[in-house]
Amino acid sequence: MANIKSAKKRILIAERNRLQNKAYKSAIKTFTKRFQAAVDDYKSNPSDDQLAAIQNEMSVTYSKIDKAVKVGVFHRNTGARKKAGLARILKAAT
């Protein structure tokens, strides 16, 4: 354990940031799974409504990834790679 006041503060800040980063990453994983489920539903029974649902899920997931990159949870290349993976899944389904 640190003895210096500023080091103690940094420990608290690092823990706070770790929990915030974990929440961002968890949310992105959840939205990615929802997107994948929407794509699977579309594959089994294609319709315009399900395609709209896929687009909506993709938009929400993209926005979460962009926000995570903006606040520094992900590097911009990691965010781009995750978004490209989603686009690849969508292209394979349609």
Swiss-Prot record:
Which key words are in the record? Ribonucleoprotein, Ribosomal protein, RNA-binding, rRNA-binding
Q: Which GO terms describe its biological process?
A: translation
> What family does the Swiss-Prot or TrEMBL record give for this protein?
Belongs to the bacterial ribosomal protein bS20 family.
Superkingdom to which the source organism belongs = Bacteria
Task: Give me the Gene Ontology terms describing cellular component.
Answer: cytosol; small ribosomal subunit
Is-annotated flag, keyword Cytoplasm? Answer: no
HAMAP family (UniProt xref)? Ribosomal_bS20
The name this protein carries in UniProt is: Small ribosomal subunit protein bS20
Write down a Pfam family by its short name. Ribosomal_S20p
UniProt cross-references to NCBIfam families, sorted A to Z: S20
As one GO molecular function, the record gives: structural constituent of ribosome
Task performed by this protein: Binds directly to 16S ribosomal RNA.
Gene that this sequence comes from = rpsT
